[in-house]
Regions:
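Extended basic-aromatic, gly/pro-enriched interface segments that bind polyanionic ligands
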Residues: 115, 136-224, 228-232, 236, ...
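Conserved SAM-binding loop of SAM-dependent methyltransferases across substrates and taxa
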Residues: 119-138
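A short glycine-rich, Lys/Arg-flanked "PGG" loop and its adjoining helix->strand segment in the class I
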Residues: 238-250
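Conserved beta-strand signature within the Rossmann-like core of class I S-adenosyl-L-methionine
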Residues: 250-258
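Core SAM-dependent methyltransferase catalytic element
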Residues: 222, 264-283
Length: 283
């Protein structure tokens, strides 16, 4: 039976998850067991271990393996302007509406959070769009973009702002030449855009902080949390959504992944902005 399989996966993975919690403080117990089994299984094969018990012994006696396992579990696949339709809507409808309302209210602060930002492509994409919009409107605004992730290595890469061609292939040529400089086969984001994004380590299941500590108080105008909820069971999805809800200012925007939606406890607190895209407004 499926439930028996799930229970067995939880049983055999628990010692490994407990060890990760003990050594690094990351709680993966709310992640989907099947996903964890697949990703940990990749390291089991790579280390030639015959089962999860043997792999745990390897993990406990090979310090470098811990980082390799975390890399596999928190795998970060992203690129600039990933999901072109979503970013077209952000550029053409969402950001202009937010900025125009800010200008009308004489509110010169714009606060954005990119949760699970990986190597920074998503928040940097937003920084580029905001720069272009403010330049077009001839408007000045204090822009605060916060990118968070649980992967230290990914955040270190984000801080370097140096990307291979595969990461920037979705960027229009005009924006690429304007906001990046070529370095060999890679592209480096210019300092004026890079400085707009603040990166920090943050676990969405952190029980101590409802919002990223670096952001101080949340109250975001715009939050992106794409393709993160799909990794969690419903109990942990509710925990994450509670944070997202609390972090958003009234009438602000939340963007989820294509296969994601507000959890049952929070559906009535959000209205869909676009029928064909997972863009929601807090009500």
């Amino acid at each position: 039976m499926i439930n028996d399989t799930k229970q067995e996966q939880v049983r055999v993975l628990k010692p490994i998850l407990d060890y990760l919690m003990e050594k690094r403080g990351f709680d993966f117990s709310g992640y989907r067991p099947a996903m964890l089994a697949r990703r940990i299984g990749k390291r089991l094969i790579a280390t030639a271990c015959k089962d999860f018990s043997e792999y745990l012994f390897c993990l406990q006696n090979t310090p470098a393996e811990l980082d390799k396992l975390l890399d596999v579990i928190t795998i970060n696949v992203s690129r600039f302007f990933r999901d072109s339709l979503t970013f077209e809507l952000i550029a053409d409808r969402i950001l202009p509406a937010i900025v125009h309302e800010k200008i009308r209210l004489k509110d010169h602060s714009l606060r954005i959070w990119s949760a699970g930002c990986a190597r920074g492509e998503e928040p940097y994409s937003l920084a580029i769009l905001i720069h272009e919009l403010l330049e077009k409107e001839e408007a000045a605004m204090n822009v605060h973009i916060f990118g968070t992730d649980i992967d230290c290595g990914a955040l270190a890469d984000a801080g370097k702002a140096l990307y291979p061609l595969s990461s920037v292939e979705n960027i229009k040529h005009r924006l690429l030449t304007k906001h990046f400089t070529a370095e060999g086969s890679c592209f480096r984001l210019i300092p004026d855009i890079k400085k707009r994004v603040n990166f920090s380590l943050y676990d969405m299941l952190d029980k101590k902080h409802g919002v990223p500590p670096e952001s101080v108080f949340g109250n975001f105008d715009f939050v992106l949390c794409r393709n993160l909820l799909i990794y969690f069971n419903i109990e942990y999805q509710e925990i994450v959504f509670a944070k997202l809800y609390q972090s958003l200012a009234k009438n602000s925007i939340l963007i989820l992944g294509e296969a994601e939606a507000p959890t049952p406890a929070y559906r009535r607190h959000f209205s869909r902005v676009v029928d064909f895209s997972p863009i929601y407004r807090k009500i």
